Every structure is written in structure tokens, then in C-alpha cells.
Amino acid sequence: MSRRLLAADVRHLPPGEVIPAGTEVIDGVPTAALTVLAALRGSIEVGVWQMTAGGVRDVEGDEVFLVLDGHATVRFDDGETVELRPGALVRLCAGEQTEWRVHETLRKLYVST
């Protein structure tokens, strides 16, 4: 790509570096992958993350993401549940404890600090 065009189509990037799916797997054998597209001033990172079907618990960092593909449900430690489908725009806050149930491989474009 170029310094300006980071990906021609982020929906179809091959999976990136394999990373832990969460801090604790609670269902199935999910795998996660991450492709960092840009590191911006300070600690701001832009990338694509995906996870296969299964369930995990995690502790979040500050992040905003847009779901590109797939289907999942995220339950937050305050009891709120968010259904994730393509087009959903979600904010995560540092320190939040979450439970992810991925029903169909989930792919998201994220911006995090």
C-alpha cells in the first residue's frame, strides 16, 4: 500500500498475527488475529482484529471499533449487552471487564490508545 492508502479493502485482508483471544477462554477454541495498519502520534493504533466462534472474557483498553463482518454479543461488567453485527460502532473503556460470545467470525476495524 502507500503511506496514505493503508488497505484497499479492510474487509478482505488476510488474518494477521495470531494473538490470545482474551484473558480467559470460556467456550470453544476461539482464535484471534490482529493486523496493525497504522501507529499514530503517541500510542494511537489503527488496525483490524478478528476472532473465530467461541467465548472469552477480557479486560479492555480505550478503543472505538466498527464491525466489518460477523456476529457476536458482548456483555459488559455493568450488565449492558451489545449485539455486534456489520455496521455497529462501539466504544470500549480502559479497565472494563467484558464477555465476548462470537457466533460467526467477527472482524472489526479499531482505533485504540
PLM regions and their residue ranges:
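Conserved short histidine dyad/triad with adjacent acidic residue
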Residues: 40-60, 93-94
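Ligand-binding loop in jelly-roll beta-barrel domains
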Residues: 81, 88, 94-113
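Conserved hydrophobic/aromatic beta-strand scaffold that supports enzyme active sites
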Residues: 46-48, 64, 81, 89-91
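Short, conserved beta-strand element in jelly-roll/cupin
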Residues: 51, 59-74
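A short, N-terminal "cap"/entry segment at the start of jelly-roll beta-barrel domains
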Residues: 1-47
